[in-house]
A protein has these predicted regions:
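Core catalytic lobe of class I
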Residues: 1-207
């Protein structure tokens, strides 16, 4: 046991890593929660069962590539219905999408007080809780995460034709996702068995 740690005491390794990287000059931009409805069962009886993991968005500079539109979420049906109901010109959001500022003509009512569906927003900025269930993987790597998780990160953080680096490549989920999105990838893995798994799973490339 690490010196200074107590039995049953959370060490907080994800946050320790995030703070260490920030101290090294990185910018900690977001703490994203990966929420799972089908998490790994736990036998604990003196605390809640864990059903999430942290994903930290870290950058090397204040300005960086981030494609918010590529991972935008569809707006809820109730939100769309409220837009279609229309608002009077005196409403505080008459010419504004809440949270996005003024947009020319986007919310101005037409005759009868309804919005033009062609101008109505259909998506919103992605939130920082991502509900992505785990998926079964029959290979020998027990901690493989779902491709959709990697795909979301790649779409937001890597332009088309860019290169994705995974320094803990494991069974190659990141490479699989990158290849499916027409990105190149570099995977680093110490375990030779995992390298073999990744190569067979991806089916080619530079793994």
């Amino acid at each position: 046991m690490k010196a200074g740690c107590k039995q049953k005491d959370l060490i907080g390794i994800p946050w320790q890593l995030a703070f260490a990287l920030r101290s090294d000059g990185w910018y900690l931009r977001s703490d994203i929660i990966w929420l799972k409805e089908n998490p790994m069962p736990e036998s604990c009886r003196d605390r809640p069962s864990r059903c999430y993991e942290h994903i930290f968005l870290l950058t090397k500079s204040k300005k960086y590539y981030y494609d918010a539109a590529a991972i935008a979420e569809p707006i809820a049906p109730g939100t769309a219905a409220r837009y279609r109901q229309g608002r009077g010109a005196g409403h505080k959001y008459a010419e504004e999408i809440p949270g996005q500022g003024k947009v020319q003509g986007i919310n101005k009512t037409r005759s009868g007080g309804y919005y033009d569906d062609a101008l109505m927003p259909t998506t919103r900025n992605k939130r920082d809780v991502w509900l992505i269930n785990t998926v079964p993987y029959k290979g020998g790597h027990f901690a493989a995460y779902p491709p959709k998780l990697a795909e979301t990160c790649i779409l937001a953080g890597c332009p088309a034709g860019g290169v994705v680096l995974d320094p803990f490549f494991g069974s190659g989920t990141t490479g699989l996702a990158a290849k499916s999105l027409d990105r190149r990838y570099i995977g680093i893995e110490l375990n030779a068995e995992y390298c073999t798994l990744a190569g067979a799973r991806i089916g080619g490339g530079n793994t």
